[in-house]
């Protein structure tokens, strides 16, 4: 009888754990996709390598636009997140235009740095919690 009770308690704990895991904030796939492109363009630019940014500027812009069009998760401040995503899209549009205009690497580095800072505002300050997700670089 003790073993049955122990098994039932263990099953109950597993069920509660499973429900808790499911109620945690789901990842925002569009943010993760943008972050992957941002990391692949910003970090080389920090080191003076603008080639990845020049090659992927349009892709970065498209990812920002896709992210902007996606549903904002409940664990983000909706108004602040929307406004900051709008800014991020404007920044990536400008980056794409400046790449096409063949501006200096110094100017492009400044633009991608600003866009990177905007990304981190969304990832950190726009959250309803104190967490800062997705900055494993």
Residue locations for each model-derived region?
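Immediate post-signal-peptide N-terminus of mature secreted/exported proteins
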Residues: 22-58, 128-134
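Bacterial Sec-dependent N-terminal signal peptides
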Residues: 1-25
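Second-shell loop/turn segments in exported
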Residues: 42-50, 71, 98-105
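Charged, amphipathic alpha-helical oligomerization/scaffolding segments
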Residues: 33, 37-40, 52-55, 59-62, ...
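Short, structured helix-loop boundary elements
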Residues: 28-31, 50, 57, 78, ...
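Short, solvent-exposed, charged loop/turn and helix-capping segments
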Residues: 64-82, 101
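Surface-exposed, polar helix/loop patches in the mature regions of secreted/periplasmic/lumenal proteins
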Residues: 81-137
């Amino acid at each position: 009888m003790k073993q049955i009770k122990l098994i039932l308690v263990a099953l109950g704990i597993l069920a509660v754990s499973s429900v808790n895991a499911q109620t945690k904030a789901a990842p925002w796939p569009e943010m993760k996709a943008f972050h992957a492109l941002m990391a692949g363009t910003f970090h080389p630019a920090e080191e003076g390598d603008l080639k990845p940014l020049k090659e992927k500027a349009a892709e970065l812009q498209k990812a920002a636009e896709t992210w902007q069009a996606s549903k904002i998760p409940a664990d983000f401040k909706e108004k602040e997140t929307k406004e900051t995503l709008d800014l991020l899209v404007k920044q990536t549009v400008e980056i794409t235009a400046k790449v096409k205009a063949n501006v200096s690497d110094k100017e492009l580095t400044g633009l991608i740095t600003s866009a990177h800072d905007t990304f981190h505002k969304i990832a950190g300050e726009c959250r309803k919690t104190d967490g800062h997700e997705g900055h494993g670089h």
